[in-house]
Amino acid sequence: MIKLKRLSDKPVLMPKAENEWERAAVFNTAAIYDNGLFHLIYRATDIGPHAKYGKYISRLGYAVSKDGINFMRLDKPVMSNETEQELRGLEDPRIVKIDGIYYMMYTGFGDRFQDDYRICLATSKNLIDWERKGVVLDEPNKDASLFPEKINGKYVMLHRRYPDIWIAFSDDLKNWYDHKPILKPIPNTWESARVGIGGPPIKTKDGWFLIYHAADDNNVYRLGAVLLDLEDPSKVIARQKEPILEPELGWEKEGYIPNVVFSCGNAVKDDTIYVYYGGADTVIGVAILEMKDIKF
């Protein structure tokens, strides 16, 4: 059975009081291991989601580490709410690198009308300077990522049309087609209410290893795992019945949104997967999985 092992019982990244934009929470981070370093693009807020004053706005910060645990960070965000679609912020980024370019999908939250959240895309050559490419799908949608390489010459995206995980294909990153659901909630289980992806899929010899999040009827968020076919990733070839990580530590159970472990990023170094996750929508933790232990 696949289980994640926490590298630390403490968060690896916490809010920073002296930086106003990230003084309340840091969570739900993208992650990638590249050029010998662990890179995070993390979501941060200046107030809590239930604050009686001000607006809850998410921005994206950057942190870097040599060992995956001890991080240095920039004092200013790398992306802030600068467009109409981002009036209330940029949420839950996920990053892949294809042909030397970093592609980041994130949720732009406009809050101009009901369900005003959209998948957005930005690109970068250095993880610091980002160029917005705009809205990917003009519909209420979130939890999206590209696969880290083209499959059969096409870009492939996972996204979330509530309450399922969907897949879609594109030739140009603008026009998406062949949308279909690939993973659905299972009634009366830990994944009964909704499912959505964690970080981008990871290529293994047996298939695309995908970590996903799921909520139950009590809004407890856990992480699960599936394996997708290498050539046709719309096919789920294995799905573990049990979660691979669930809220157990104090900072996973208590925070702005209690009982949540929620991942947006995996950093693969050698044969170890570092899974970064938000704890209770307040701090960031990390757990690992050895590639050899991916056994369904």
Swiss-Prot record:
Keyword Transferase in annotation: yes
Disulfide bonds: none
pH behavior: Optimum pH is 6.0 for phosphorolytic activity. Optimum pH is 5.0 for the synthetic reaction.
EC number: 2.4.1.340
UniProt KW keywords: Carbohydrate metabolism, Glycosyltransferase, Transferase
GO-annotated biological processes: GDP-mannose biosynthetic process
InterPro entries from the UniProt entry: Glyco_hydro_beta-prop_sf, Mannoside_phosphorylase
Pfam family membership, one: Glyco_hydro_130
Transmembrane annotation, as ranges: none
Superkingdom field: Bacteria
Pathway: Nucleotide-sugar biosynthesis; GDP-alpha-D-mannose biosynthesis
Reaction equations catalysed: [(1->2)-beta-D-mannosyl](n) + phosphate = [(1->2)-beta-D-mannosyl](n-1) + alpha-D-mannose 1-phosphate
GO terms for MF: glycosyltransferase activity
Keyword Transferase among record annotations: yes
Assembly with partners or alone: Homodimer.
Family: Belongs to the glycosyl hydrolase 130 family.
Role according to the record: Probably involved in a salvage pathway for GDP-D-mannose biosynthesis. Catalyzes the reversible phosphorolysis of 1,2-beta-oligomannan. In phosphorolytic reactions, prefers 1,2-beta-oligomannan with a degree of polymerization (DP) of 3, 4 and 5. Produces alpha-D-mannose 1-phosphate, which is the precursor of GDP-D-mannose.
Protein name: 1,2-beta-oligomannan phosphorylase
Organism: Thermoanaerobacter sp. (strain X514)
